[in-house]
Amino acid sequence: MRIIFMGSPEFSVVALSSILNNTEHKIVGVYTRVPKPAGRGKVLTKTPIHTVAEMHGLTVYTPKSLKRIEEQDRIKELNPDVIVVVAYGLIIPKEVLSIPKYGCINIHPSLLPRWRGAAPIHYAILHGDSQTGVTIMQMNEGWDEGDILLQKKLSIDEQDNIETLSSKLSNLGGAMLVEVLNNIDNLVPVAQNEDNATYTNKIEDFHIDINETAEVACRRIRALYPRAFVFFNGKRLRILQASYYYDDNISSLKPSSILNSGMHIKCKGNTILVPLVVQMEGKTLCSIKDFVCGYNVKDYSIT
């Protein structure tokens, strides 16, 4: 088949590589987001997909929108049998959805219809889900509402953070994509159950709420790794790894109380958050053991 691939972040790379390495299909074009300034030097930086595509000699397109007639005509000229979309970042208009013989298929890292939207992996961790998975669906004009072509489950380990779980789901999605492309004529699309639909939003708040339980705080640290933080005496302190426990003898203490020199933090109820790896703003990351050597932490406040 002739395939157009649309993707941008690191999560998309395994899917593109799986087509290149494990199928006989031909990629006739790769669409990705335009290069953007990044880092302190604001150097114009290509997306991971852009870099990988060029390494394989593939033609790369970086339109700012697919709504323009000129862009749609170019896709028609490429004559794809199918368009594969993996975290592309642009809206696919109905005019593009209808171009390929097999339409547009999308790899979505959740067990649809659970966790539609922009942050399904984050939400699975935040909500304490014991499992998630990958859904490959036939795209329509809705928000992750297309019929399911293939779906597989994946257990979430208690220590998984957004990086480790994303990697596992990316690998699973790549293998599933090969299966779908090689059997596309034999697949029977299954409609999603709208009664079970849940939705996610882009996450912009990375603050850890100490007034929640320590278990919820730990989920937040894992889901927002490595950006979750508390304020330590007014300065941002990132917590990159933590554990928690219960203590029935601390019910009289208010949340945010620092219990000992190891910086165990009282949270909601009788739960205690134990930071393990931290990073003070402007400093390098370190173990909590090294961090507390520089502070008498019980004299400081956590918010």
Swiss-Prot record:
GO cellular component terms given for this protein: cytosol
GO molecular-function terms, A-Z: methionyl-tRNA formyltransferase activity
Top EC group: transferase
Listed EC numbers: 2.1.2.9
Record-listed (6S)-5,6,7,8-tetrahydrofolate binding positions: S110, L111, L112, P113
Record InterPro entries: Fmt (IPR005794), Formyl_trans_C (IPR005793), Formyl_transf_N (IPR002376), Formyl_transf_N_sf (IPR036477), Formyl_transferase-like_C_sf (IPR011034), Met-tRNA-FMT_C (IPR044135), Met-tRNA-FMT_N (IPR041711)
SUPFAM superfamilies: FMT C-terminal domain-like, Formyltransferase
Function summary: Attaches a formyl group to the free amino group of methionyl-tRNA(fMet). The formyl group appears to play a dual role in the initiator identity of N-formylmethionyl-tRNA by promoting its recognition by IF2 and preventing the misappropriation of this tRNA by the elongation apparatus.
NCBIfam families xref list: fmt (TIGR00460)
Annotated protein name in UniProt: Methionyl-tRNA formyltransferase
Species annotation: Ehrlichia ruminantium (strain Welgevonden)
Taxonomic lineage of the native organism: Bacteria, Pseudomonadati, Pseudomonadota, Alphaproteobacteria, Rickettsiales
Gene: fmt
